[in-house]
Amino acid sequence: MSEEPVSGTTVEIEEDTHTPPNSPVLETFSLSPEPEAEACPNTDRYLSANLLCKHLQRQSAIVLDSIKDQLQVPTSVSELSCAYERSLLCPNIPPKQQSNGTCEANPKLNFYPTFLVPETLATYHIFFVNQKIPVSCKANRAKADKALTLQEGDCLPDYETMDTVSRVFEGLGGEVVAENALQNNDSVLVELKEDNPRLAVLKRNLSVSHFAYPAVHLPPKIITTVMNNLLVKRANPSADVSELDPDGGQEVVSDTELSRWLNTSDPETLEKQRKLVMGSVLVTVVLECMQRLFTSKDMVKKIGETLHYTFRHGYVSLACKISNVELTNVVTYMGILHENRLGQTTLHHTIQGETRRDYIRDSIFLILIHTWQTAMGIWQQCLEEENLKELAKLVQKIKKPLYTETSQRLMGKQLANVVFPPKLLETFNKGLPDIVNQSMMQNFRSFILERSGILPSMTCALPTDFIPIHFKECPPTMWPYTYLLRLANFFMYHNDLCYDMEGEGLLEHYCRCNLCTPHRCLATNPAMLNETQLIGTFDIRGPGGENGAESSSGLKLTAGMWTSAFLRKFESSDYHAHKIHFYENQSKPPSVEPTPCVITQSSILAQLHDIKKAREEFLLKKGQGQYLDPHTGEPLNAAGPSVESGHEFQGDGRHREPKRGRHFRQRGGPRKPPRAHAGGEPDVRGTTS
């Protein structure tokens, strides 16, 4: 049956259109006859000639703004790049702080290369110590994960000195070489029989003998001043030979003076004492300063909180869920709060077992390195010539006590008391560590591996793979890295990051560490659980103001208010900073009874629960409409035989007649009319009937 064509003009198809053989002629119809469009439309109105130049104009304005305060115009690309980075990343005027505490977005950063590492901020992070990898490194220890396993009751690790480690062994020890191992004399890594899959692939694809370890030494100004006054006088560089310091390169303490202090002229004894002092200046004082910075109770707590943000773990994960705000988008650096939504905090959930522990341990190690380097960079920048002169005077006072001390640990403590005073330590404890995410540490990890000549995308290497796990298996210059590795391992177990203990229901965000249980965990704090059920369910206000004005005072528990109080909630008496002491393994109750965060009085909490329950019962019994469970969506007041209904329907399904029953009798006067819904709007719990 043919159809009549639609009225309109017919437009024939172009001749170059290819159609199958014996196909009908294709025609298109225009419903409204209009003049034909121009063959070549004018696009000047859409993209003008000057439109694309706005990008260059904006970038030129930023570059011009970066050099306006300089006395001389930069004449090279490097000078201009440095000025450009300083203007963007280190402005003279600090960025404006928003109401939520973070800095406002800087549109100038849109013109900085996104994945380029800025040189201005990396004042201390770009320095490395290229050193030969010990054969006894962690990668050549097949049972390193088992050796690093910690249990209930284990304490903070301590560092070693030459007092306890007199000899160092760098070798494979009792490790068994794999039968099919490749013979590679250029690589330190050896294929072992019990290597895990990650290390087996790494050793087969990587040949390496040296590694660029991140610099962890004290600020250069400090080291130079201490060495000039304790070890060897440094010769001042000068272009004129006549101006060279004749005392340059000479020992600060002569053999005559040292023999008089030690009451001996034995050359071996004098040389041994000099080595002890040199070791304390170059190694032990660094270890002592690290221990003082990272092991105070407040610092251990702050490191634990940082790790909970970095790995979106425990109480931080619970706070994100209840507040419906991704708190892990916040990062800090040098006292400035930033909001960045590109960071990842859940990458560790994609791996399990030993690989997961290796990744988390390495990430925490990098966080400690990053924190230490940040502190050293700030310290270096703050030192002036007057500070160094006063430091030289203090070092001169302890010169004789150091050279007459026989314990290298005590030497390090005496020296740390001078160069790392309590005031400086207190300042660092207040501002560090920074809150970071896993993406930042992954970039830091790639930066370290690239400086070591290792391509991160083609190997599965971690910086901690090239660090020995025992002090007796590495040279003293590697001891700071071993100490930070063991500290990172302790923080991993102390904050319960190595195992996934989460479950369903109340155990969804369960963490066994002292920061979470028992006070910030719904499974162990029933009072706080009851409080969370009241969030957003009430709004209590006082009497109204004059002329019907609303009350200015009231009580309303919002998710934001509860989350703020929840994040501040902490009981120091139930926190064990220097020991793994999980709450679930204890038979005694907590020192402080777990309480809610905002509504701390149990009587008020109970009354609010009774009001909430009575309101729910009233809505289910007296309210009209169908009420749905907010979580499952199931009807809470399902339709059924009603003792209040006066209609029973009969019929064939199409025409039903109401039937009066005995329950339709009117008692106590005429029946009240049903409540009317305003505009038919649904209740917050369900939908209107």
Curated annotation (Swiss-Prot):
Stretches assigned to coiled coil: none
Region annotation (Binding to host EIF4G) ranges: 226-289
Biased segments, Basic and acidic residues type: 645-655, 678-689
Pfam families named among the record's database cross-references: Adeno_100
Protein name (database record): Shutoff protein
Modified positions (Phosphotyrosine) in chain numbering: Y309, Y627
Extra information: All late proteins expressed from the major late promoter are produced by alternative splicing and alternative polyadenylation of the same gene giving rise to non-overlapping ORFs. A leader sequence is present in the N-terminus of all these mRNAs and is recognized by the viral shutoff protein to provide expression although conventional translation via ribosome scanning from the cap has been shut off in the host cell.
Up-regulation conditions: Expressed in the late phase of the viral replicative cycle.
Keywords of this entry: Chaperone, Eukaryotic host gene expression shutoff by virus, Eukaryotic host translation shutoff by virus, Host cytoplasm, Host gene expression shutoff by virus, Host-virus interaction, Inhibition of eukaryotic host translation factors by virus, Late protein, Methylation, Phosphoprotein, RNA-binding, Translational shunt, Transport
PTM (free text): Might be cleaved by the viral protease.
Family: Belongs to the adenoviridae shutoff protein family.
Record localization: Host cytoplasm
UniProt source species: Canine adenovirus serotype 1 (strain CLL) (CAdV-1)
Chaperone as UniProt keyword: yes
Superkingdom field: Viruses
